[in-house]
């Protein structure tokens, strides 16, 4: 009896949700038709007036009233009166005293491909050929089995890397493969970078560096593995049918 009531409520819930979605309609956007709000072309209702040669009171070729080629009245090609292409007056083509000018330089458009490329590059800042650069770590305290190497490490630990290069953990079958690859690329990259600065490494340096980087790579693997499994658990949790049904019911209560 209880199961039948629960099934009925679930059925009513989904019917109500689909009915509510079906009744929703798009509202028409406010505003007029095409080209409302004034013309965008010069000389048609724009605040700067007509952009073509003015036709004043005088006739064509007359000495007054703005005739074509005349010294007064703002004629076409004259130094006064705001004629076409003139340095004075209002409403001249290409002048600073009007709005909506033809030759106003357009603002540079942002290239979306460049933006997307920059975003992608920022995701692996410091990366190297498909490898990611881990966060800085404190150099581990390691005992090498003899006093000389222990003392050498304490005195020279600043010369060794405090970050490691690695690939995502899902590209490896086990921890050993991850650590092996991580140690090789990190030691190689640090050695090349340091050598170009004029500093060389001895055999003792390489031996100690490999041990130090190995411990750091193990730590990096543990961090990445934990984060990877947590992401996977979250996806499984929110994709289960009971959780989806519960979320749908809560959304229905909020919207309804």
UniProtKB/Swiss-Prot annotation:
Prodomain residues: 234-256
Signal peptide: 1-24
Annotated spans, 5 X 8 AA tandem repeats of P-H-G-G-G-W-G-Q: 54-95
Membrane topology: Lipid-anchor; GPI-anchor
Biased composition (Gly residues): 56-97
One GO biological process term: protein homooligomerization
Region (Interaction with GRB2, ERI3 and SYN1), start-end ranges: 25-233
Record-given protein name: Major prion protein
Organism: Moschus chrysogaster
